[in-house]
Amino acid sequence: MKLKTNIRHLHGSIRVPGDKSISHRSIIFGSLAEGETKVYDILRGEDVLSTMQVFRDLGVEIEDKDGVITIQGVGMAGLKAPQNALNMGNSGTSIRLISGVLAGADFEVEMFGDDSLSKRPMDRVTLPLKKMGVSISGQTERDLPPLRLKGTKNLRPIHYELPIASAQVKSALMFAALQAKGESVIIEKEYTRNHTEDMLKQFGGHLSVDGKKITVQGPQKLTGQKVVVPGDISSAAFWLVAGLIAPNSRLVLQNVGINETRTGIIDVIRAMGGKLEITEIDPVAKSATLIVESSDLKGTEIGGALIPRLIDELPIIALLATQAQGVTVIKDAEELKVKETDRIQVVADALNSMGADITPTADGMIIKGKSALHGARVNTFGDHRIGMMTAIAALLVADGEVELDRAEAINTSYPSFFDDLESLIHG
């Protein structure tokens, strides 16, 4: 598709779609709880719809009516063997978390996904699940999907140190631990998003968190709840950057989730000198209104414990860095290589084709700014965040056209992205 270029300003106020991580987990917890769960403001992107369909296939009644998702929970032991293989679509979150959920189910399943998911290694979650007594295997020594899994009612608790920072692996092991008899201990390498911990408590579960050490005593029962999903800061990130780098711009983003494990991009914007205001903070919902304005930016260094707090935002942060004076270094981010694409290489190739100066490294990028961007043809390779990054980059292009191939990938997380972009261009 041909993207909008050379815009004069961005103005307006929007509510970004519901948080993808919380949306996935609300369906999972609602299904495993006893009683009814109602979920408001859920993200209806393709990844979350995949999770919803998987739990329907596992025998859970889920109704989507009048903007509210109603889940009739079946309890920890109530899932039923599916008639067919479970389709996870493009969703790494779905296949990893649901592997943990099915660890205690005494039936065999096959889980598969699209071409992109089939290239993503699952050994980081299959290895610890095997230690708990689960029979699970995939293709090659990295356990690429499709996966075959047979759970067990005699799930063993686990004491496990995560070799990488991964909220998905941590969450999969927590779901498994809820079904094991005894105490499981999970130790994180770095702090990662803690939505699973928060929602476990919300649904009446128990755990203790001591620094990076999480202890779960199993088995447990959960109780259905009302869940209100805040806006996704990973989706808001595209507008935060757009408002900072587009000329004569001011954007107001309402009801954005600001869980402290997800706000690394706010730290980066401030380090780069961006104009960012946080107002209307709701400490219970962990949400706020974010306001950004066009800014003069400077390069910075991004690495270490900051990386898990902004791993999904690094593509759009790379674009931000191309519009900052000086050098920005992104390091300790080798995890980018096993996302929907190798995001280190694909981001560098896409932005360099538009005139940026980015050098890929083994664990990140070196970005020299400030760059004038020009027209190009960019392929998302099925990666939603590459698509949205390119659409924001195109706004700055004064010379030439920007063509985006496989733009439909954006529907994975933000189906209304181009509608919101139009409203801000004309605001």
Swiss-Prot record:
Homotetramer. 3-phosphoshikimate binds at S21, R25, S166, A167, Q168, D312, K339. CDD domains: EPT-like. Pathway: Metabolic intermediate biosynthesis; chorismate biosynthesis; chorismate from D-erythrose 4-phosphate and phosphoenolpyruvate: step 6/7. This is 3-phosphoshikimate 1-carboxyvinyltransferase. GO terms for molecular function: 3-phosphoshikimate 1-carboxyvinyltransferase activity. It is an enzyme of class 2 (transferase). GO terms for cellular component: cytoplasm. It catalyses: 3-phosphoshikimate + phosphoenolpyruvate = 5-O-(1-carboxyvinyl)-3-phosphoshikimate + phosphate. NCBIfam families: aroA. Disulfide bonds: none annotated.
